[in-house]
Amino acid sequence: LQEDINKVDWTAGYAFAAYREPDRKIVNSILDETKTDLPNYYVSDPMRYYQDLKDHGVSLAANYEHKFTVSDKFAPVLDGGVYGEYKSRTFDARRFGYNLLGKGYDRYADWDYAGLFCDENISADRIWMRETTTNSDSYTSENILGAAYVSAKLNYGEALNANIGVRMEYYNLKMDGYSSDGTTPVHLDNRTSDFFPSVNISYNLSAKHLVRAAYGRSVNRPEFREVV
């Protein structure tokens, strides 16, 4: 291709993100307001949480530009391109809670956390662990985005500047999981095709004054975390 008339460029990318939380310990402390001498707290709803999240993303884009020379004042530029993107996510979590309703110990004693969960207090009649994981704690999701655009720069001398274009996008979002109570399977498969035109025209009345008109249409697409 003639470099002063045509330009071609392309980009490819891959992204991977992982987040693992092996053992988050959660303890709620409740203040006993009946005692006025020293603050006395007791433990409520302790929990251990494990999380594993993996994201993969692949993208590919290509652009083409061609310059025309019609006259000294009019040299339009035509642009076009395509873009493709694929993303996937897997999310798994497990939850474990402690049953504190046993009768073989004083739940409201002035324990520190290490003392409360000591080996002597862990048994079937005192404190025991139970899994509270539900189906809603895991899901898989993926999306596909395909786009193509064409635009033209139609400047005439130094007085008129005009840019017009349109972009077409195809978007497909899929997700498999469960409702928040973990009982109802949820399968999401959203497909949309949209056109996004844009126009930007300005006319220079003088070195200090110009008239401008512009129009554009865009969209904000949800992230995985906003869908779940």
What are these model-predicted stretches?
Residues L1-V77:
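Outer-membrane beta-barrel domain signature, strongest for Gram-negative TonB-dependent receptors
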Residues A12-G13, Q51-A61, K67-V228:
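Structural signature of Gram-negative outer-membrane beta-barrels, strongest in the C-terminal barrel
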